[in-house]
Amino acid sequence: MRCPFCGHMESQVKDSRPSEDGAAIRRRRLCPECGGRFTTFERVQLRELTIVKRSGRRSPFDREKLVRSISIATRKRPVDPERVERMVNGIVRQLESQGETELPSSAVGEMVMKALKSLDDVAYVRYASVYRDFRETSDFAKFLGAEGLSDVADDEL
């Protein structure tokens, strides 16, 4: 594997063990060129997934993009990163088990919303505000009212 520090094409595996949730193999590596140490994760990929965007454009499913979007929603919240990782693993498993190679981005978004709702209400609302493209405070009020998360009426904003 290429060293992320110096770009050398080979590295040595110094330690290998399953991750805590058993969904990946964690490997500690050493670059013989620069001495840099880094960690890699190896995961099973059942099939290549393609996400169909709202615009109709297609792009390969990017697990790290999913992790980043959820991490942004949970930032500065009392949510354990391991719970986020388990949640992402569950969403990926659901996507792969659907048997489809092309999935609409809305399916991914709805799965994330459902998972975040059970994880943290604030993270759920943060994610929804981007996913549902809230433009005004009234959009938040309508969403919170529909979800039963608030008694705020539109005229109180």
From Swiss-Prot:
Q: What remark does the entry make about the cofactor?
A: Binds 1 zinc ion.
Any one Gene Ontology MF annotation carried by this entry is: ATP binding
Q: Which GO terms describe its biological process?
A: negative regulation of DNA-templated transcription
The alphabetized UniProt keywords are: ATP-binding, DNA-binding, Metal-binding, Nucleotide-binding, Repressor, Transcription, Transcription regulation, Zinc, Zinc-finger
A Pfam cross-reference name: Zn_ribbon_NrdR
Query: What residues form the membrane-spanning segments?
Result: none
Residue ranges of the unnamed zinc fingers? Answer: 3-34
Its source organism is: Caulobacter sp. (strain K31)
Describe the location of the ATP-cone domain by residue ranges: 49-139
Q: What is this protein called?
A: Transcriptional repressor NrdR
Q: Which domain of life is it from?
A: Bacteria
**Names of required cofactors:** Zn(2+)
Q: What does this protein do?
A: Negatively regulates transcription of bacterial ribonucleotide reductase nrd genes and operons by binding to NrdR-boxes.
Give the family this protein belongs to, as stated in its UniProt record.
Belongs to the NrdR family.
